[in-house]
Amino acid sequence: SLQIYNLQSVSDGPKRDAMADSYLFYDIETTGLNKAFDQILQFAAIRTDRQLNEIDRHAVTVKLRPDVIPSPAAVLTNRIPVTEFSNGLCEYEAAEQIHRLMNQPGTISLGYNTMGFDDEFMRFSFHRNLLPPYTHQYKNSCSRMDLYPITIIYRLYKKDVLIWPEIDGKLSLKLEHLGSANRLISGQSHEAIVDVAVTVKLARRFFKKEKMWRYLEGYFDKETDAHRMAQLPVGLQSAAGDHCSGLMVSGEYGPGQNYQIPVISIGSSLPYPNQTLWLRLDLPQLRETTPEATAETTWVIRKRMGEPGIVLPPHDRYWQKIGKDRNAIFQENLEWLQANQ
């Protein structure tokens, strides 16, 4: 049954309790897409242990702030009746409850595309209500993951775990389509508690291949992610040093490119040393690069440790997914880079 979270203090120390090492699957419904000015209307979460056995559920309804006008597109999507906008907790009370949930020691917060949308929305909500916006990412052994990039990897390399829906002849990885195709939905899509329940069921499907699940968890740990990237083979040597090569996996690249592109490391960001920079190598226009046209002919990707995209080693079983045409472009670009140092 649903329950509103009972407020309790969160220790600054490393102490763990019965909730330690748990997943907190969550979803939000909002008034729009603007993280600075829109607000959360619904928050729902299901906490599980590390074997995905449910521990408890939480639901929070948030009253509309007087300075917020909901986006018509958001209202059509989440289908929350306008008459309900005046119900629920004020934003501060709701943010405080959610903050305590996500900061429970040992909590791994995750959802479907949460690192692409929900997590940043949560940070803005916490900051606006004078709550620390980042502690759920690192403090008290807390961390975060995202099921969307995990779904992409399973689609590429463990396809048998799901039925993969096609809409108008194209693969769709939208949660509602995955839920319908695999009979995971019980209720109205885009209602927070329904979506988070689907997310948990989806995770349980993936967890049947537990070795894969545990391996992918490592890509959301900064140290593990950094170690794996340090093990990538050298693809190019230059006066600047060795440049590792790999395959960057992200939803940004879409099903037409199997969600992955060949890349080579080109160093770290100067203003943000914790970010690595990667050059995409499957675009033919790269060989047209001049000092004046760099912005038009190159695609540089910023990669934060422990966050998507996922960089896979260039093993044959992964590399074959880019196809012969893109592999040929990659080889030509690599030779061009070597010749034009």
How would you label these PLM feature ranges?
Residues 12-55:
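Entry/capping segment at the start of metal-dependent catalytic domains
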Residues 30, 64, 149, 282-285:
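Short, flexible loop/turn elements at secondary-structure junctions
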Residues 37-43, 47-80, 100-211:
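Metal-dependent phosphoesterase core characteristic of DEDDh/y 3'-5' exonuclease domains
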Residues 77-94:
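Metal-dependent phosphoesterase signature
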Residues 204-335:
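Acidic two-metal-ion nuclease catalytic site recognized across multiple nuclease folds
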Residues 338-341:
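C-terminal structural cap/anchor segments
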